[in-house]
A protein has these predicted regions:
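Terminal low-complexity, poorly structured segments
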Residues: 20, 49, 69-72
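N-terminal first-folded block
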Residues: 3-34, 38-41
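Glycine-rich beta-strand-turn "strand-cap" elements at beta-sheet edges
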Residues: 2, 9, 41-50, 75-96
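Acidic/polar helix N-cap motif
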Residues: 13-16, 48, 60
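An amphipathic, aromatic/His-enriched active-site/gating alpha helix that lines ligand/cofactor pockets
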Residues: 26-39, 57-90
């Protein structure tokens, strides 16, 4: 099965980027314990402080689904509730 990736753009309320970055950094540390989460990166656009991106890679689509229903993502959602204006993910198959 091909690896699976998700590229997420998170639009946040002005003035809350540091809070979102802190929450994402904690989430990144927690997902290291998810055996089929291969990579999780937080990206900061240079020219837009109302957006944060994440790049996520999983063993396969089933691993991504497990991540979506896992405790770390539930905690992240709680931590950033009310300050995320819009969230857009692009689900991808990784070409080897």
């Amino acid at each position: 099965m091909p690896r699976f990736a998700n590229v997420v753009t998170i639009e946040i309320a002005p003035g809350h980027r540091d809070q979102v970055v802190t929450a994402l950094a904690a989430h990144k540390a927690r997902v290291k314990d998810e055996p089929d989460t291969l990579q999780f990166e937080v990206l900061l656009p240079k020219d837009d402080d109302t957006k944060v991106l994440s790049f996520e890679m999983y063993r396969d689509a089933a691993a991504f689904e497990a991540h979506l229903n896992g405790p770390s993502l539930a905690k992240l959602r709680e931590e950033i509730a009310g300050i995320v204006m819009k969230l857009h993910g692009v689900r991808c198959v990784v070409v080897d």
